[in-house]
Amino acid sequence: MVLTSKQKEELNGSILDYFESSQYKSSFEEFKKETGTELDVKKKGLLEKKWTSVIRLQKKVLDLEAKVAQLEEELNSGGGRGGGRGRGKEDALPRPPEKHILTGHRNCINSVKFHPSFSLMVSASEDATIKVWDFESGEFERTLKGHTNAVQDIDFDKTGNLLASCSADLTIKLWDFQTYDCVKTLHGHDHNVSCVRFTPSGDQLISSSRDKTIKVWEAATGYCIKTLVGHEDWVRKITVSEDGSCIASCSNDQTIKTWNIVKGECLATYREHSHVVECLAFSTANIIDIPGSLLSTPEGKSKVKQGPGGNLVGQCGYLATGSRDKTIKIWELATGRCLATYIGHDNWVRAVRFHPCGKFLLSVGDDKTIRVWDIAQGRCIKTINEAHTHFISCLDFCLHNPHIATGGVDDVIKVWKLQ
């Protein structure tokens, strides 16, 4: 590339200024003599400015190239159903960049949860606090204080008027979300309480703990009405089926169990993971038929009562589980079979959620990625790399507004718009 006379003059002037400002006296005099260039105050710092501009432009080019590569991957990953083409609002997926980055917690984020009706969300942190945010504006609303140790999990009842939280301080707290007052503190677990979930009716609350038990509480009174025993180690997470009849739990003992809430009995135990099972989620009612599933045929649907635990667990459909073995497994509850194993995460899988449209599963993990899995194809169709600067610990869907939220060990929450 040949420089014009004006460009040469500008370059020589900026180099001369650089020699002078860096006190390279001999180089300054020699260069000035050879080029016949004089110092010009207008060119003060010009070389440094151009250099930093080039670096910024290089970074932008690299970012754009990465985005183009990701979009090309989406377009080539299977067309309308699983790929980037033909997707409507109901099956929109998260796309970078994030809409908001919410900062304020002083330690890692353990749980995020959207309010069922309003444009509010809550976050629970190792800093022993719960924070309330407006996820549309990205504004911080308030902090709920009461726990004396890390807040491990949070959940709303169906009305959004009651918030439950659980903590490493061995307690569960119920908060009136209209006044933000703590109205009840539940005692009963003997170790870190790691997960809490309301049943769909809101009448009962389910909790799991490092004490190896699951407890069922009466929300109105705060009384423990059942204790479910069966796991041999820390019960990490629990999830409740859409009809409220069945719960599933996962544990450090590398197993998943399903339970009859009414009878307090274990219905079935699932073993295929080779490490701690960190997370799990029941499928949505509108999930697509999974290839090889008993439920994918009319005849099979009539036979669900023959599965482990009988008709009750069979009616719950499918269960997704994520593990420290870096895999996600899809289980057919009617037969107890593992239908699919998703491989792609490079570290622990920390949270899984079925997309409300029933076609996709989303996951996050310690590899700092958000991944989208096409259930019909049984493969990852989208990856958001470096979604956080540290491990991603939690994920939630907003069911009334197309957003997801993620929380990480980097102490921040990110809100992502689905599009």
Swiss-Prot record:
Localization terms from the record: Cytoplasm, Cytoskeleton; Cytoplasm, Cytoskeleton, Microtubule organizing center, Centrosome; Cytoplasm, Cytoskeleton, Spindle
This protein's record includes keyword Hydrolase: no
Cellular component aspect of the GO annotation: centrosomal corona; centrosome; cytoplasm; microtubule; microtubule associated complex; microtubule cytoskeleton; spindle
Start and end residues of each LisH domain: 7-39
Coiled-coil features, chain-numbered ranges: 52-79
GO biological process: adenylate cyclase-activating G protein-coupled cAMP receptor signaling pathway; cell differentiation; cell division; centrosome localization; establishment of mitotic spindle orientation; Golgi localization; microtubule sliding; phagocytosis
MF GO annotations: dynein complex binding; dynein heavy chain binding; microtubule binding; small GTPase binding
Keyword terms: Cell cycle, Cell division, Coiled coil, Cytoplasm, Cytoskeleton, Differentiation, Microtubule, Mitosis, Repeat, Transport, WD repeat
Alphabetical list of InterPro entries matching this protein: Dynein_regulator_LIS1, G-protein_beta_WD-40_rep, LIS1_N, LisH, PAC1-like_LisH-like_dom, WD40/YVTN_repeat-like_dom_sf, WD40_repeat_CS, WD40_repeat_dom_sf
Sequence ranges of the WD repeats: 104-145, 147-187, 188-227, 230-271, 272-341, 344-385, 387-419
Biased composition (Basic and acidic residues): 87-100
Region (Disordered): 74-100
Pfam families, per database record: LisH_PAC1, WD40
Family from the record: Belongs to the WD repeat LIS1/nudF family.
Subunit structure: Interacts with dynein and mtaA/CP224 in the cortical attachment of microtubules. Interacts with rac1A.
Note on domains (UniProt): Dimerization mediated by the LisH domain may be required to activate dynein.
Free-text function comment from the UniProt entry: Positively regulates the activity of the minus-end directed microtubule motor protein dynein. May enhance dynein-mediated microtubule sliding by targeting dynein to the microtubule plus end. Required for several dynein- and microtubule-dependent processes such as the maintenance of Golgi integrity, the coupling of the nucleus and centrosome and dynein/dynactin-mediated interactions of microtubule tips with the cell cortex.
Protein name: Lissencephaly-1 homolog
Organism encoding this protein: Dictyostelium discoideum
